[in-house]
């Protein structure tokens, strides 16, 4: 199982703080979360970390990995 943690607007919009999922890639994680009602546009623009390291949709996952998804921060 993969542990997925959501932060920022992703957490607020979905009501999901942490979820256990079965997925082989980050892309699969994003597809599963979209099925929970998170808008794909929000998922596509998020910051992705796997086990604390920068990742992308093509990143492969193994059992026990932690995926962190954060809304990008903007300001001025």
Q: What are the language-model segments listed below?
A:
Residues 1-75:
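Ubiquitin-like/PB1-type beta-grasp interaction modules and other compact soluble beta-rich domains
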């Amino acid at each position: 199982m993969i542990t997925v943690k959501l932060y920022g607007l992703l957490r607020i919009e979905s009501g999901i703080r942490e979820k256990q999922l079965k997925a082989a890639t980050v892309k699969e994680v994003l597809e599963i979360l979209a099925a929970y009602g998170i808008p794909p546009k929000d998922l596509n623009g998020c910051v992705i970390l796997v086990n604390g390291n920068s990742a992308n949709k093509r990143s492969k996952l193994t059992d026990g990995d932690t995926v962190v998804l954060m809304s990008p921060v903007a300001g001025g």
